[in-house]
Amino acid sequence: MSKRTFQPSNLKRKRSHGFRARMATVGGRKVLARRRAKGRARLSA
Protein backbone atom coordinates (compact mmCIF):
# COMPACT_ATOMS: atom_id res chain seq x y z
CA MET A 1 0.00 0.00 0.00
CA SER A 2 1.37 3.38 -0.96
CA LYS A 3 0.83 6.38 1.29
CA ARG A 4 -1.40 9.29 0.37
CA THR A 5 0.41 12.02 -1.55
CA PHE A 6 -1.32 14.91 0.24
CA GLN A 7 0.24 15.38 3.69
CA PRO A 8 -1.23 18.71 4.91
CA SER A 9 1.03 21.29 6.54
CA ASN A 10 -0.15 24.86 7.09
CA LEU A 11 3.41 26.20 7.11
CA LYS A 12 4.30 24.71 3.71
CA ARG A 13 0.91 25.80 2.38
CA LYS A 14 1.48 29.42 3.40
CA ARG A 15 5.07 29.48 2.17
CA SER A 16 4.22 28.26 -1.30
CA HIS A 17 0.71 29.66 -1.86
CA GLY A 18 0.37 32.45 0.71
CA PHE A 19 -0.16 36.14 0.04
CA ARG A 20 3.45 37.11 0.80
CA ALA A 21 4.73 34.40 -1.53
CA ARG A 22 2.44 35.69 -4.31
CA MET A 23 3.57 39.29 -3.77
CA ALA A 24 7.23 38.28 -3.94
CA THR A 25 7.20 37.57 -7.68
CA VAL A 26 5.85 39.30 -10.79
CA GLY A 27 3.95 36.16 -11.76
CA GLY A 28 2.44 35.94 -8.30
CA ARG A 29 1.27 39.54 -8.49
CA LYS A 30 -0.37 38.72 -11.81
CA VAL A 31 -2.15 35.80 -10.14
CA LEU A 32 -3.52 38.15 -7.47
CA ALA A 33 -4.52 40.70 -10.11
CA ARG A 34 -6.44 38.04 -12.06
CA ARG A 35 -8.18 36.83 -8.92
CA ARG A 36 -9.13 40.40 -7.97
CA ALA A 37 -10.48 41.00 -11.48
CA LYS A 38 -12.53 37.81 -11.25
CA GLY A 39 -13.90 38.91 -7.89
CA ARG A 40 -12.59 36.12 -5.69
CA ALA A 41 -13.45 36.43 -1.99
CA ARG A 42 -10.13 34.76 -1.06
CA LEU A 43 -7.11 35.86 -3.07
CA SER A 44 -4.59 33.43 -1.59
CA ALA A 45 -4.15 30.60 0.91
UniProtKB/Swiss-Prot annotation:
Superkingdom as given in the UniProt entry: Bacteria
Keywords attached to this entry: Ribonucleoprotein, Ribosomal protein
Compositionally biased residues, Polar residues: 1-10
Keyword Iron: no
Record GO cellular component, one term: ribonucleoprotein complex
Renumbered residue ranges of the record's region Disordered: 1-21
Any one GO biological process: translation
Residue spans of biased composition, Basic residues class: 11-20
Cited Gene3D superfamilies: 1.10.287.3980
GO molecular function, one term: structural constituent of ribosome
Coiled-coil region: none
InterPro entries recorded: Ribosomal_bL34, Ribosomal_bL34_CS
Family, per entry: Belongs to the bacterial ribosomal protein bL34 family.
NCBIfam families: rpmH_bact (TIGR01030)
Name recorded for this polypeptide: Large ribosomal subunit protein bL34
Source organism (scientific name): Shewanella baltica (strain OS155 / ATCC BAA-1091)
Lineage: Bacteria, Pseudomonadati, Pseudomonadota, Gammaproteobacteria, Alteromonadales
